């Protein structure tokens, strides 16, 4: 039994070392990419959302941080403080916002209430990233399920020089389940997460679009 235990412990150690090495390599690539982008900060035009965004950014970022550090701070913030469920806070905004500001209403509700579904996570991340200056927008389509098959989903991408990089805090939050975050869906090309996403041929919701 002791031999079996030691073998399991050894294998677990190897697994953790592999994850750590993978994250370090990934961080280096993502850092170089995001820090190379010329920033164009953009608000939503919906005051409650823009106020929530600036209050959030003032708490979790500062001027000494690089673009990569700010984006990772936003991603971590959503994973660490939000949970999957019904975004009740959005209702006070969606009752009166025009169709082109529904995404901003969802984002405001998520940043205030910290509970929401995939579109709420994505809208919140999009407004934070756009305020920093990155060309971030939501994508509607399907994603793979852990138990097999596909399901409807909304995620975000950041477009850098015509290449879309997936950022999906809701899925990474679900994978982490309160444990360490391994960033499986952070700054990944569709090829790097092959089979995980199928963008729809049309935009069903139209929350946010490319600059």
Model-assigned labels for residue ranges:
Residues 2-12:
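Bacterial N-terminal signal peptides that target proteins for export
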Residues 43-110:
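Secondary-structure boundary elements
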């Amino acid at each position: 039994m002791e031999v079996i235990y030691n073998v399991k412990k050894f294998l677990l150690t190897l697994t953790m070392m592999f994850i750590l090495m993978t994250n370090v390599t990934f961080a280096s690539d993502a850092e170089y990419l995001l820090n190379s982008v010329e920033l164009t900060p953009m608000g939503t035009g919906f005051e409650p959302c823009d106020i929530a965004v600036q209050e959030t950014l003032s708490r979790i970022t500062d001027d000494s941080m690089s673009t990569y550090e700010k984006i990772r701070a936003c991603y971590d913030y959503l994973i660490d403080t939000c949970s999957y469920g019904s975004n009740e806070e959005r209702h006070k905004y969606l009752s009166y916002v025009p169709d082109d500001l529904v995404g901003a209403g969802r984002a405001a509700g998520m940043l205030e209430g910290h509970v929401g579904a995939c579109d709420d996570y994505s809208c919140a991340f999009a407004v934070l990233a756009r305020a920093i200056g990155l060309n971030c927008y939501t994508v509607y389509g399907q994603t793979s399920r852990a138990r097999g098959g596909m399901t409807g989903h909304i995620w975000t991408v950041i477009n850098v020089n015509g290449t879309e990089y997936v950022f999906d805090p809701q899925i990474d939050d679900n994978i982490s389940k309160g444990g360490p975050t391994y960033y499986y869906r952070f700054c990944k090309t569709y090829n790097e997460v092959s089979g995980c996403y199928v963008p729809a041929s049309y935009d069903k919701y139209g929350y946010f679009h490319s600059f």
